[in-house]
């Protein structure tokens, strides 16, 4: 399975900065996503950038230039769904979609998501997508709550437009999404507490 990192947003809630390049404990946010993907069973990593994130594109092309399995995709930057739809043509089978602003993502979590999707797909062939969720009580400050579940910022989707039959996977590990400056402060505390 391949992966797509969404890294073309405007970063509005962070004051209009390129969120993938925000430093957290000395590392760029996007590195917290690329690193575990490289250590996982994912084959190729596509990174969607846009006119909103030109420095992110430069950073990826420089920092990961020796990785032949990392490819930058230029999108319009009109919005998450629009950018995702622009990337669909790069894929011929289901793929992971990962936000560029996640911390605490680990390769074993990625592998378990991939394995779970293929297991579900083998039992129910018409399943096309997987939404990964975290129990609300594990999440420090959820901005979205679906019946006690918080989106983890990582999903599996099929390369087609429109409705996709979706299953849900609930994981116990906290994958933390950085949306605001308060989230960034909280993430720093969590990382220091965990010694990361």
Swiss-Prot record:
One Pfam family in the UniProt entry: NTP_transf_3
Catalyzed reactions: adenosylcob(III)inamide phosphate + GTP + H(+) = adenosylcob(III)inamide-GDP + diphosphate
GO terms, molecular function: cobinamide phosphate guanylyltransferase activity; GTP binding; nucleotidyltransferase activity
Pathway assigned to this chain's UniProt record: Cofactor biosynthesis; adenosylcobalamin biosynthesis
Disulfide bonds: none
Enzyme class: transferase
The enzyme's E.C. designation: 2.7.7.62
Keyword Signal belongs to the record: no
GO biological process terms, semicolon-separated: cobalamin biosynthetic process
Top-rank taxon: Archaea
Alphabetical UniProt keywords: Cobalamin biosynthesis, GTP-binding, Nucleotide-binding, Nucleotidyltransferase, Transferase
Subunit structure: Homodimer.
Function: Guanylyltransferase that catalyzes the synthesis of adenosylcobinamide-GDP (AdoCbi-GDP) from adenosylcobinamide-phosphate (AdoCbi-P) and GTP. Is involved in adenosylcobalamin biosynthesis. Binds one GTP per dimer. Cannot use other NTPs or GDP. Does not display AdoCbi kinase activity. Is also able to catalyze the condensation of 2-phospho-L-lactate (LP) with GTP in vitro to form PPi and (2S)-lactyl-2-diphospho-5'-guanosine (LPPG), but is much less efficient than CofC, the presumed enzyme catalyzing this reaction in vivo.
Other facts noted in the record for this chain: Binds GTP first, before binding AdoCbi-P.
Protein name stated in the entry: Adenosylcobinamide-phosphate guanylyltransferase
Species annotation: Methanocaldococcus jannaschii (strain ATCC 43067 / DSM 2661 / JAL-1 / JCM 10045 / NBRC 100440) (Methanococcus jannaschii)
Gene: cobY
